């Protein structure tokens, strides 16, 4: 979770809790627990790079002949993308998605402008030569330079590099007509005694192209990651002029890189030895360049090593990446694993997917979802609203007690407890629905901000529900507010004001008048930079809450109001004393 997200959500939580303090009697609020953070290992950019990124040597030893040649390009097109392969390195050089456009609604190359390709094998020979297959010229065994497939069709592009007698490298790409997954097949023949450390790396080298207008926000979502031993390993190149590295041993189920809405991941079909991640943020443009590598065994006794990988290069669609069956969905940021992620994975996304089965407009889906949440929480919110109304009716009684027993706190607390019990109210009852909804609200923030389902889906004046619904851009930024005016937050702030206006309060009018204005304004400031979908959800939820409050105010009668006895209950000692006096 990035720093700005934590700060924004924490401020919203604080505002809501402060508001609850003014809407209910003062209660002791436990301080929020500090979220434990761990620093990633940072290495100075001046340190020498590891073998994965060190500069190529002038000679290639056994591979010197293969370093000379001519490049042949092969284009494979399916229902979802157009991929360009190069015989130099037998690598993937370009991938243009068909069903997704960039922030300017133009087709884009997800692999960016890196000229030498992203996918390669890397190893160190025993005579000290660093070999990156992107420096070598392969032979295209398939010969065909262009192929289009669709549906259930499959097509394989094969490359071969003959290094010496009985020594060769074979690489094959297997494409499917309707899938983002590409099988990547590797054979190393006759190199068991030539490669140092009996290990080679399969690496994805290069960050994915930024596709959104807000590059700073996209950089906050860019990272390299791996799933190792059932745990997510993340590397974020958050600072310029520093190289960030992470290297771990063990069996990994995937490594990959991502930007805000897309990912490129390598999934081994056989056991890996470990992972290596590296990242660096480019100066001045927010772009973060990443490398993610799998370490694979190459036994000295083996005459041939054959490994197959699945390469997923495509959108961060939850159902699609989860279908890979290796925990690739963990690369998607849904906030805290123990709090907001369960809401996102088990509630929000399933309901959205179900509704999307027969409703194509996500704005309508959000409205229906807000209604469903209100329906589920209706019994709780009804009980809490009635409790707050009763608390407001009790205020004159409570104030009288506070004056009467101001010098006897114990007696005052005893009488307050008695009155609450007789009136059938819970002093904290009004807080419960709001507190229960906060994890859901935070989870929706992450889903709306990072889920590709909402990307470039509009509703009313909002062109994209995953970003703020700006109706006017200033051209400069106002501190805390932003560089634009979003309209959903304005409407939402109006409903917050109206809801407070018609909700009975247990605090003095002077304090309530301040909060009546201050709370909507603060919510307006914070929601102005949040996804339009979140503003729409909160707007509709508040509208349903206002309707509920009008109904409660209209249907509540005098008989529903608490009736309490102001006379203090006599203690047991005083009762016995009275009985003893009567006998005399």
UniProtKB/Swiss-Prot annotation:
State which residue ranges cross the membrane: 6-26, 363-383, 428-448, 474-494, 514-534
Q: Which GO terms describe its biological process?
A: protein insertion into membrane; protein transport
In terms of one coarse class, where is the protein primarily found?
Answer: membrane
Q: What InterPro entries does the entry give?
A: Membr_insert_YidC, Membr_insert_YidC_N, YidC/ALB3/OXA1/COX18, YidC/Oxa/ALB_C, YidC_ALB_C, YidC_periplasmic_sf
Q: Which UniProt keywords apply?
A: Cell inner membrane, Cell membrane, Chaperone, Membrane, Protein transport, Transmembrane, Transmembrane helix, Transport
Q: Where in the cell is it found?
A: Cell inner membrane
Q: Name one Pfam family in it.
A: 60KD_IMP
Q: Which GO terms describe its molecular function?
A: membrane insertase activity
What GO terms fall under cellular component here?
plasma membrane
Q: How does it sit in the membrane?
A: Multi-pass membrane protein
Q: How does it assemble?
A: Interacts with the Sec translocase complex via SecD. Specifically interacts with transmembrane segments of nascent integral membrane proteins during membrane integration.
Its family remark reads: Belongs to the OXA1/ALB3/YidC family. Type 1 subfamily.
Q: What does this protein do?
A: Required for the insertion and/or proper folding and/or complex formation of integral membrane proteins into the membrane. Involved in integration of membrane proteins that insert both dependently and independently of the Sec translocase complex, as well as at least some lipoproteins. Aids folding of multispanning membrane proteins.
* Designated name of the protein: Membrane protein insertase YidC
User: What is the organism of origin for this protein?
Assistant: Chlorobium chlorochromatii (strain CaD3)
What gene name does this entry carry? yidC
């Amino acid at each position: 979770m990035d720093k700005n997200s934590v700060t924004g959500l924490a401020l919203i939580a604080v505002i809501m809790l402060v508001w609850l303090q003014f809407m209910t009697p003062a209660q002791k609020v436990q301080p929020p627990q500090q979220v434990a953070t761990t620093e990633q290992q940072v290495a100075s950019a001046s340190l020498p790079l590891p073998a994965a990124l060190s500069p190529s040597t002038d000679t290639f030893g056994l591979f010197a002949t293969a370093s000379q040649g001519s490049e042949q390009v092969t284009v494979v097109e399916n229902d979802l993308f157009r991929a360009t392969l190069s015989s130099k390195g037998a690598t993937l050089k370009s991938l243009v998605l068909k069903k997704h456009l960039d922030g300017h609604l133009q087709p884009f190359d997800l692999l960016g402008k890196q000229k030498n390709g992203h996918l390669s094998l890397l190893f160190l020979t025993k005579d000290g030569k660093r070999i990156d297959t992107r420096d070598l010229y392969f032979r295209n065994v398939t010969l065909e330079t262009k192929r289009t497939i669709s549906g259930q069709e499959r097509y394989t592009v094969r490359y071969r590099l003959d290094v010496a007698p009985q020594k060769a490298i074979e690489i094959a790409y297997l494409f499917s007509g309707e899938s983002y997954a590409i099988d990547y097949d590797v054979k190393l023949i006759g190199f068991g005694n030539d490669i140092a450390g009996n290990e080679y790396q399969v690496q994805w080298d290069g960050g994915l192209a930024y596709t959104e207008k807000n590059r700073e926000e996209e950089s906050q979502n860019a990272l390299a990651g791996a799933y190792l031993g059932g745990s997510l390993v993340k590397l974020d190149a958050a600072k310029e002029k520093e190289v960030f590295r992470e290297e771990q041993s063990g069996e990994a189920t995937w490594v990959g890189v991502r930007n805000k809405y897309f990912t490129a991941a390598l999934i081994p079909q056989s056991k890996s030895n470990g992972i290596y991640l590296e990242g660096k943020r480019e100066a001045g443009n927010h772009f973060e360049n990443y490398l993610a590598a799998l370490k694979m065994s190459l036994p000295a006794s083996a005459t041939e090593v054959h490994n197959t990988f699945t390469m997923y290069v495509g959108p961060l669609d939850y159902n699609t990446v989860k279908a890979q069956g290796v925990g690739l969905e963990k690369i998607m940021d849904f906030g805290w694993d123990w709090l907001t992620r369960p809401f996102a994975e088990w509630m929000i996304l399933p309901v959205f997917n179900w509704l999307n089965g027969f409703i194509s407009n996500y704005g309508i889906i959000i409205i229906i979802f807000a209604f469903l949440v209100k329906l589920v929480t209706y019994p709780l919110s009804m009980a809490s609203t009635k409790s707050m109304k009763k608390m407001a009716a009790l205020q004159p009684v409570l104030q009288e007690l506070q004056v009467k027993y101001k010098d006897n706190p114990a007696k005052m607390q005893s009488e307050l407890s008695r009155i609450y019990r007789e009136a059938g109210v819970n002093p904290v009852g009004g807080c419960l629905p709001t507190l229960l909804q906060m994890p859901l609200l935070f989870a929706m923030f992450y889903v709306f901000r990072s889920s590709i389902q909402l990307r470039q889906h509009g509703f009313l004046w909002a062109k994209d529900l995953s970003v703020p619904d700006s109706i006017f851009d200033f051209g400069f930024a106002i501190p805390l507010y932003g560089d634009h005016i979003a309209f959903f937050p304005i409407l939402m702030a109006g409903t917050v004001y109206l809801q407070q206006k018609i909700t009975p309060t247990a605090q003095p009018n002077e304090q309530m008048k301040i909060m009546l204005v201050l709370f909507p304004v603060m919510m307006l400031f914070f929601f102005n930079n949040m996804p339009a979908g979140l503003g729409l959800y909160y707007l509709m939820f508040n509208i349903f809450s206002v309707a509920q409050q009008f109904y409660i105010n209209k249907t509540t009668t005098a008989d529903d109001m608490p009736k309490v006895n102001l006379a203090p209950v006599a203690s047991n000692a005083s009762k016995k004393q009275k009985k003893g006096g009567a006998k005399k």
